[in-house]
C-alpha cells in the first residue's frame, strides 16, 4: 500500500511540473526577440486581417429584387434515370 502511494505521489508531482512547464511562457523578451516575433506575425494572415479594411465590392447584395425568385430550387421527385 505504501509503495502505491509513493508511486502515485511521484506521478502526480511530475504531472504538476509538466503542466507548469507546458503552460508557461517566457517573461522578458528582449527588443530583438520582440521585433522577430512582430515580423513573424506580420507575414501571417492574421497580420493581413488586422491591417485590412472593408472590401470595396458589393458582396452578396441583391441588386434587383424581381430576379430573386429565378434561382429558387423547385423541389419534387427527381427525373427517372439510371440512378447511381
Curated annotation (Swiss-Prot):
Keywords: Apoplast, Hydroxylation, Secreted, Signal
4-hydroxyproline modification, residue list: 77, 79
InterPro entries found in the cross-reference section: PIP2/PIPL1 (IPR044700)
Compartment annotation: Secreted, Extracellular space, Apoplast
Composition-biased stretches (Basic and acidic residues): 58-70
Domain of life from the UniProt record: Eukaryota
Region listing for Disordered, in residue ranges: 50-84
Signal peptide feature range: 1-24
GO annotation (BP), single: innate immune response
GO cellular component terms given for this protein: apoplast
Post-translational modification: Contains 4-hydroxyproline; hydroxylated on Pro-77 and Pro-79.
Function: Endogenous secreted peptide that acts as elicitor of immune response and positive regulator of defense response. Amplifies the immune response triggered by flg22, the active epitope of bacterial flagellin. Acts as a negative regulator of root growth.
Descriptive protein name: PAMP-induced secreted peptide 2
Organism, scientific name: Arabidopsis thaliana
Lineage: Eukaryota, Viridiplantae, Streptophyta, Embryophyta, Tracheophyta
